[in-house]
Curated annotation (Swiss-Prot):
Record's keyword annotation contains Hydrolase: no
N-acetylserine carried by residues: 2
Gene Ontology CC terms, in alphabetical order: helical viral capsid; ribonucleoprotein complex
Pfam families to which the protein is assigned, alphabetical: Flexi_CP
Chief place where the protein resides: virion
Listed name of the protein: Coat protein
Family of the protein in this entry: Belongs to the potexvirus capsid protein family.
Signal peptide: none
Record GO terms (molecular function): structural molecule activity
Species for this entry: Papaya mosaic potexvirus
Length: 215
């Protein structure tokens, strides 16, 4: 057999070399977070609204802290002042949305920071109303899934502690419960007449499927 017939055939993607691997930049990215362009837009709009450029992060965290206690969904009513007298938290939330990202994505970007600021000190205000047990109360915020996202802003010395497995499970379960409740409230009838709806909120009953417990 000739050497030419034993050679590696041409491929669309030639095998990578060790030198090439060493030169590739592999910073983490996540589509669960705002893009860098959106973050820059928020920062620019905040400065235009008279937030000092050196304070945009700390002022942003005031909004994140509110959402930690009250939620970051599109239906959350943001209230209260910021530390900048002329700017309310509601105005900051509007700036975030004007950038093209959602409030939850924005909060998720700062999740590791608020985790360090509040964990084991002051739980989310609504933890009990949300159905969390005391042992998992520090996971009772709706952007908890950003805490361990490596593309989010990281605290200078890392997380004060990683979430426990109980906290992860409690948050994931609570998220599914909220999805179930939203589905139950969805009305797919064409009329609100009780004759048509028979008093039902939805024409089909949503279900939650749980995995069996480990044996």
């Amino acid at each position: 057999m000739s050497k030419s017939s034993m050679s590696t055939p041409n491929t669309a993607f030639p095998a990578i070399t060790q030198e090439q691997m060493s030169s590739i930049k592999v910073d983490p990215t996540s589509n669960l977070l705002p893009s860098q362009e959106q973050l820059k837009s928020v920062s620019t709009l905040m400065v235009a609204a008279k937030v000092p450029a050196a304070s945009v992060t700390t002022v942003a965290l005031e909004l994140v802290n509110f959402c930690y206690d009250n939620g970051s969904s599109a239906y959350t009513t943001v209230t209260g002042p910021s530390s900048i007298p002329e700017i309310s938290l509601a105005q900051l939330a509007s700036i975030v949305k004007a950038s093209g990202t959602s409030l939850r994505k924005f909060c998720r970007y700062f999740a590791p920071i608020i985790w360090n600021l509040r964990t084991d000190k002051m739980a989310p205000a609504n933890w009990e109303a949300s159905g969390y047990k005391p042992s998992a109360k520090f996971a009772a915020f709706d952007f908890f899934d950003g805490v361990e996202n490596p593309a989010a802003m990281q605290p200078p010395s890392g997380l004060i502690r990683s979430p426990t497995q109980e906290e992860r499970i409690a948050n994931a379960t609570n998220k599914q419960v909220h999805l179930f409740q939203a589905a139950a409230q969805d009305n797919n009838f064409t009329s609100n007449s009780a004759f048509i709806t028979k008093g039902q909120i939805s024409g089909s009953t949503p279900t939650i499927q749980f995995l069996p417990p480990p044996e």
